[in-house]
């Protein structure tokens, strides 16, 4: 994987692109990082949408916390 410095730089660039009015579709394994910058999110399991909704709500979802956020 990328070093944490590069990951942070890439996420900063993605946020700037989005702030300029461009929609960004992000597919990312780092759920915590992705949900922290997303507006809307989908959780996929075996290729199917298992959960969807507001990213902040998903970040606080008990299923998501247990399975993807190491909480």
Feature names for model-found ranges:
Residues 1-71:
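Glycine-rich phosphate-binding loops of nucleotide-dependent enzymes
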